[in-house]
């Protein structure tokens, strides 16, 4: 039996995906007087930058302070300093939510995922949304839609063109590209955070943890520096690039969790690190994707755009 639509919502602008790109797009639209709907399939906003994944917004600004993002992203950073001086990720989620839900022209739908869309004459009329927490099927009508979902789910549900993997070097004249196109992408990560305590803390790994050898580990962390793990965010725990990052997401996450617990097991129990007083404080059970489907727009960014320096 097909589930009937429980509610409809009419907006001028509908953004699918509440990561940083979608959140900023929705806020920008709302501030310009546009009635906007923001649809996010997680309970929090921010995507990879949320408390669920915990990858800070950095980029070139990490190395060159004057290269960092301005605009709404800088506004978020300033608000975070004011409301979250200890840089708690849980409080950061609240900052992200406050600076969206507080916009009078913006309606935020959390725990809501796009399941389909209706097109007519090359335009999207509405998107169908399933909200997990309320078990409601919502239908959002809008004049304009933005696919900021990361997995390009709106494009997948419509006739919009999208691609994934690596193009061959001849397609866009990229000299450092691969000779033949393939499905390889950047991988995903389940990050961990560790914390120092006042006394020794043992660690017993779960049964699913992967056992790592010194040979495997030495290429990722300098075992000659016994305290190096203290300032590491473990971004290098990356898997899945040779698999389908969307269809195989749960399988990849399972492997990542085994790796994450295995890495901490090695740090705690190998004797190679000064980690006696350190404890595992948090593990992400949501794989943070570096890459997925890519919507094909009016212009495709290519290697020459980045290396030529003309911009």
Regions found by a protein language model. Name each.
Residues 48, 111, 123-126, 133-311:
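Flavin (FAD/FMN)-binding glycine-rich loop and adjacent Rossmann-like elements that form
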Residues 40, 129-131:
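Residue-level signal for short segments within beta-strands and strand-turn junctions
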Residues 17-20:
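Glycine-rich Rossmann-fold phosphate-binding loop(s) that bind the pyrophosphate
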Residues 103-106, 132-136:
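Short, charged helix-to-loop "capping" segments that act as catalytic/coupling loops
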Residues 22-25:
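Short glycine/serine/threonine-rich phosphate/pyrophosphate-binding segments
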Residues 1-3, 131-134:
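A generic local structural motif
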Residues 2, 6-10, 28-35, 39-123, ...:
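Conserved N-terminal/central alpha/beta ligand/cofactor-binding core
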